[in-house]
C-alpha cells in the first residue's frame, strides 16, 4: 500500500471532509531508509520530483568524523549506535539518523547529516 501525505478525510471531531480534488501522485511518500550498521555499503538511487536523483544510504560501516579541536576530518569505522532521539528502538537495531550518537574508532560522535537523504554519514566528534 502506498504512503500518502495528503490531508486526512476526517476532522478532529470525526466529521467527514469531502475532497475538492482527487489524490495526486505528488502527494505520495516513501518509507524511510533507516540506515543501519553493516559490513557492506548499500546505496539506493531514487528518482525524485523534477527528474532529480536522491541517494539513500541503507547500510554502511563508515562515517566521516570531524574533530573540532584539531580541525581534521577522517573516515573511520562505526561500531554501534549509543543513543538516538528519533526512536528508542533504533538503538538496538543500530539505525543511524540525524542527531544519533554513535561509537567510532575516534570516540563518541554525533551524526550531522541525513544518511537516508544525503547518502553519506557525517559526524562531529563529541568532547568528553
Curated annotation (Swiss-Prot):
Domain of life here?
A: Archaea
Q: Which InterPro entries match?
A: Ribosomal_eS8 (IPR001047), Ribosomal_eS8_CS (IPR018283), Ribosomal_protein_eS8_arc (IPR020919), Ribosomal_Se8/biogenesis_NSA2 (IPR022309)
Q: Which GO molecular function, any one, fits this protein according to its record?
A: structural constituent of ribosome
> Can you quote a single GO CC term?
ribonucleoprotein complex
Q: Which GO biological process categories is it annotated with?
A: translation
Coiled-coil features, chain-numbered ranges: none
Record keyword Acyltransferase present: no
Query: In the UniProt record, does the keyword Ribosomal protein occur?
Result: yes
Pfam family, any one:
Ribosomal_S8e
Q: Which UniProt keywords apply?
A: Ribonucleoprotein, Ribosomal protein
- NCBIfam families with a match to the protein in the record: eS8 (TIGR00307)
Q: What family is reported? A: Belongs to the eukaryotic ribosomal protein eS8 family.
The subunit field of the Swiss-Prot or TrEMBL record says:
Part of the 30S ribosomal subunit.
Record-given protein name: Small ribosomal subunit protein eS8
Species this chain originates from: Methanococcus maripaludis (strain C7 / ATCC BAA-1331)
